[in-house]
Amino acid sequence: MAPVPGYKAAALAVALLAVPGSALAEKKVAGAILPEEAEKIGENRFRVPKTYDEVLKFFRTVYGPGRYARRPIADTPSVKAVHIDNPEAKPGQWDGLNVYELKNENETRIFVLVKPK
């Protein structure tokens, strides 16, 4: 019995629908996956129109804490920040992410640290 025409196309469509919509629209910088809403404000610096906790939740799903270590780097009245380490960084790729909240400006930013070549 011959395969049904369009079978492969239908299988591909089903596979694409199984992928969450946000996974298709994520941004990549030096190999690091950032939230799709990230807006570039400088070299390797991005502003995200989400809360600090929402951005950390995004990174927990993309970069699990078991594999990507986190450490607090600031917790002051004006800034709260955490560093996410990439244990598999190669030259030219992301070495770490600094996620920080500027409390006075009520915004969350991401700084992508790139390993030197």
PLM features: what roles do these ranges have?
Residues 1-11:
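Bacterial N-terminal signal peptides that target proteins for export
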Residues 5, 20-117:
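An acidic-aromatic pocket/loop used at catalytic or ligand-binding sites
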Residues 10-19:
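Bacterial N-terminal signal peptides
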